[in-house]
């Protein structure tokens, strides 16, 4: 064992030679690599670059003088630089030494008594740390002896295994663990002192003595990044600012983060005091209150030196009085501050923001406070502070939530605010963000009313919403937080308080329920946030119909829709789909004409517009009343004058003006058995013509008088046309006479209808093609129309006795697809080429048909095709 001990400790005269035993050399090589890697890893933990042993040796020779004291400190520097390498190297030998009872060697570590070594061996200590372990000088015998020391770190008595020269004193340690802990503590202390700007108080030499490693790094021109606190070489640094504010960042990423942080803070500082008074003071005060600067974005808004001296944040300095509350937490430790900064998110205080300030506030910034009440979970002493409903939320996520909340409050609280503060010039709901913050008028203090709390606390929200004082009488109370958007369904127009822009008002109904899900907004985000507004703009489809059907009492007896059953109304309704709504004047004319017509003819076709108008517009409604049905048989409500008896069984409603209704007039023939040969009177033919060529209805409309007697025949003819095939041909016949006759004129000459008899066959084929087109255009009709037809069909059920009759309700809903499936056929609006010349008004139908396909929907089209096939 003695030999091994000697081998492990080469004599001093052999220090310059490599170890005699190759095994020893291998171990030393391995340990050297291990030491270098371990030290580099340790340095990496503290943000230092890795150090090459040879490079370090050269640097040391260049950087320090060679006097005894400097060498002594150089030795310490090396010890600090590579504490582990020496330990493992000697620990390899230590087993032998310890086994022989020579424990002193293990404790020496070759550097433990570096001061003595430097005295005894001249320049040797300078190179000892950086040369391979074999060259490490073993401690002198007196040094190697079991020296009992009190560990400088754990304060326990033990064998001295490490010593660290701290300039004027030498600290001894009983174990590697204590040595590393002490070194780490000094490193942190010196780094913090340097960051605090106290470096000027400590000369460089002092650092060299106290923490040689730090001096070594400074000499190498390695600086600490002002953002990430990592050490990079100066050539990689980016300078930002000048003078005292000059900062250095290790990468563009750090610089950008710093700029973004400053941008956030400046933006918030410019907001009114009430909005962001507490946004940053808490964070900055916390971070600054701790001895060590907390690495949070908020701490870098200002120069490092100023940030450490300044307690109030720039926002607080702007005149915000909220700072004191947050400052109470300034003494928390760095870890605490990290948590607090997230958990205690300051919220704007509505009471501190007078309405007068709002005009200058960007819309987004103003609204967040509006919906934010004093945080519920915050102690009373610091009302401005708020914890999110979900507990501590990471700052980035919280910011996004804030943005969402900021956009929502205008809609949630906007109406209440407007109701309570109608005189506010900015109360226009169109710009929710511009209006005075709802919170402003309420001036709610820390003891926020339920109005504010509902947004913050789902627990309080449901009970408080019904009694929200600010809600306008028309507004529905916000649904409980659980309900997604129960109140969003289109509110009546009357419920929208501020007429100019009802949409935001509508938003108010549903959005309050969302508020509890999102923490109150407290941050102003400098970038635009596109927030989809869930505004279901409820444009009731019947609205256009309502406007057209406004003629008196012109609602179908079905009552399902607003489409009037009166001829004028039906024409108007038909016009709506087609886009050619009759003017009230026309509808009135139609009603008056119908009134003038004999009672028997009241159900018959009425032309609402004058003949010229009819030709110009295909707005004429042709109603052919079944002759068999009494004038009063109509189940529908006529105009006040009783003009229409729409419900009559035989009435066929053709709205020439609207492609949807005229072209799409699909009448359900109760019985497909219609005799095409039947051509009773000219009036009947005209009626047929009107039905077939819905565009030619004007003449039919003009038939009221004659049509009464011929009503039955006309109905049959029309039914024939509706049924298709031969009936259609006859319809074409009848259609010719009407073309140019004004609606008022009496029955057109029967001869032209006869002429049309010849084209009966082509008319049928044409009818087939037209049916398809008509179906397409009819597909355009709304589900409402179908419903109407169904209702009308039910009404007409009593009159179904006549096989040729179409549903009386079909007047208004000639195009109702549901009714067709039985035997009904689409009346072809497009006349044959031969007929077109005679039927100028009929020509109008073609453009309407062309327009029809735009609106048609595939399902409806399929249905129309099905109906056509059945009719065939």
UniProtKB/Swiss-Prot annotation:
Q: Where is the composition biased (Basic and acidic residues)?
A: 1-14
Q: Where is the composition biased (Low complexity)?
A: 417-433
Transmembrane keyword on record: no
Per UniProt, which keywords does this protein have?
Isopeptide bond, Metal-binding, Phosphoprotein, Repeat, Ubl conjugation, Zinc, Zinc-finger
Motif SUMO interaction motif 2 (SIM): which residue numbers?
A: 651-655
Q: Which GO terms describe its biological process?
A: animal organ development; inner ear morphogenesis
Q: Which residue numbers delimit the FCS-type Zn fingers?
A: 142-180, 216-256
- Say which domain of life the source belongs to: Eukaryota
Q: Name one GO cellular component term.
A: nucleus
Q: Where is the composition biased (Polar residues)?
A: 319-344
| Motif SUMO interaction motif 1 (SIM) location, chain numbering | 620-624
- State the Gene Ontology terms under molecular function: zinc ion binding
Q: Outline the subunit composition.
A: Interacts (via SIM domains) with SUMO1 and SUMO2.
Family stated for the protein in its record: Belongs to the SOBP family.
What is the protein name stated in its UniProt record?
A: Sine oculis-binding protein homolog
Encoded by which gene? SOBP
